[in-house]
Amino acid sequence: MIQQESELEVADNSGAKRVKCFKVLGGSKRRYAHVGDIVVASVQDAHPEGSVKKGDVVKVVIIRTKSYIKRKDGTKIRFDTNSCVLIDDKKNPKGTRIFGPVAREVRDRDFLKISSLAPEVI
């Protein structure tokens, strides 16, 4: 569960290392974001030769959360980190590689490019 001021680890090679969420998209009263949701974030830490710099405002899609994801078949899944991938306005990832597994819910939300770049979809 991601909310305002949550810090996320970036799991792609766009140049950002950490981002801080400052708006969950999807309505004025929406407070929490889960796997597959889009949030607006600010880059807190970045590689010096990356395509994004510290302080840039970016859109990210959440691919892993520490809180449980409950599925329709009754299983629960959770990850060690809160992670995200930077995306552009057309919902394509800014990076060319994704590190670590991605939850199946990302593919169900029509982020097919992200799930195809991921080494593993859980």
Curated annotation (Swiss-Prot):
SUPFAM superfamilies under this entry?
Ribosomal protein L14 (SSF50193)
Concerning Gene3D superfamilies, the annotation shows: Ribosomal protein L14
Question: InterPro entries this protein is in?
Answer: Ribosomal_uL14 (IPR000218), Ribosomal_uL14_bac-type (IPR005745), Ribosomal_uL14_sf (IPR036853)
Per its UniProt record, what SMART domains does this chain match? Ribosomal_L14
User: Has UniProt tagged this entry with the keyword Ribosomal protein?
Assistant: yes
Q: Name one GO molecular function term.
A: large ribosomal subunit rRNA binding
One GO cellular component this record assigns the protein to is: cytosolic large ribosomal subunit
> What are the recorded Gene Ontology BP terms?
translation
What does the UniProt keyword field contain? Ribonucleoprotein, Ribosomal protein, RNA-binding, rRNA-binding
Do you know which Pfam families this protein is assigned to? Ribosomal_L14 (PF00238)
Quaternary form?
Answer: Part of the 50S ribosomal subunit. Forms a cluster with proteins L3 and L19. In the 70S ribosome, L14 and L19 interact and together make contacts with the 16S rRNA in bridges B5 and B8.
| Cited function | Binds to 23S rRNA. Forms part of two intersubunit bridges in the 70S ribosome.
Q: Can you tell me which family this protein belongs to?
A: Belongs to the universal ribosomal protein uL14 family.
Q: What is this protein called?
A: Large ribosomal subunit protein uL14
